[in-house]
Amino acid sequence: MTEFWIERWREGRTGWHQPEGNASLRRHWQGTGRRVLVPLCGKTPDLVWLAEQGNEVVGVELSDIAVGSFFEEQALSFEVRDGELREYRALDLPITIFLGDYFRLRGESFDAHYDRGALVALPPDKRAAYVEHTRSLLADRAEQLLVTLEYDQDAANGPPYAVHADEVLDYWPELVRLESRDDLPNGPPKFREAGLTEMIEVVWRSTRDL
């Protein structure tokens, strides 16, 4: 799975990327002064938006192409520190991206978690391990904003994968469903090409307000 995503970035096949960021984040995020974990962050401009709201933002990404593209496209200067995961730290905003395997991120603690592209990127047999590792990094009662997709996987398949409500609540029973809307026009082109007629974006948040 790791090599799959690295190859997609290498080939420029990144139909899941949202160049303008995620609109649901901007509608529903209210927190400030948090240390926010963003797993499998890619080059999303959501990192900048979260930092501009007064948060310290920490992303984790497999692809060096994605990390380099993020800093170039956002015109951010940065410094690099070597470690088990290479650390790219912006000089102008409180943003850090760790390059490498998310499951090797340890010794960190976060009081907020934003996931727009991680859970839906993982096949079913990888999701429970992702959730368990994420929980190990979060403080008690950490704030969470999760964005998932629901669609007919007989008509099209991921990634990004459909993750339906019963599965989400098995993983995160503390989450409440805030919003559901058809987001097929903003989804990966391959879904429309496959004839998919609906792709529901669902927004979940922890029961404690951000």
Feature map (PLM): residue ranges:
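Class I SAM-dependent methyltransferase "Motif I" SAM/SAH-binding loop
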Residues: 37-44, 118
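Gly/Ala-rich phosphate-binding loop of Rossmann-like dinucleotide-binding domains
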Residues: 51-52
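Conserved catalytic-core segments centered on acid/base and nucleophilic motifs
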Residues: 47, 57, 113, 119
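Short amphipathic alpha-helical interaction patches enriched in hydrophobic/aromatic residues
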Residues: 13, 117-118
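A short, conserved alpha-helix within the catalytic core of class I
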Residues: 121-133
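Class I (Rossmann-like) S-adenosyl-L-methionine-dependent methyltransferase catalytic domain
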Residues: 1-33, 43-46, 56-95, 99-106, ...
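A short acidic, Gly/Pro-enriched loop at the edge of an enzyme's catalytic core
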Residues: 105-113
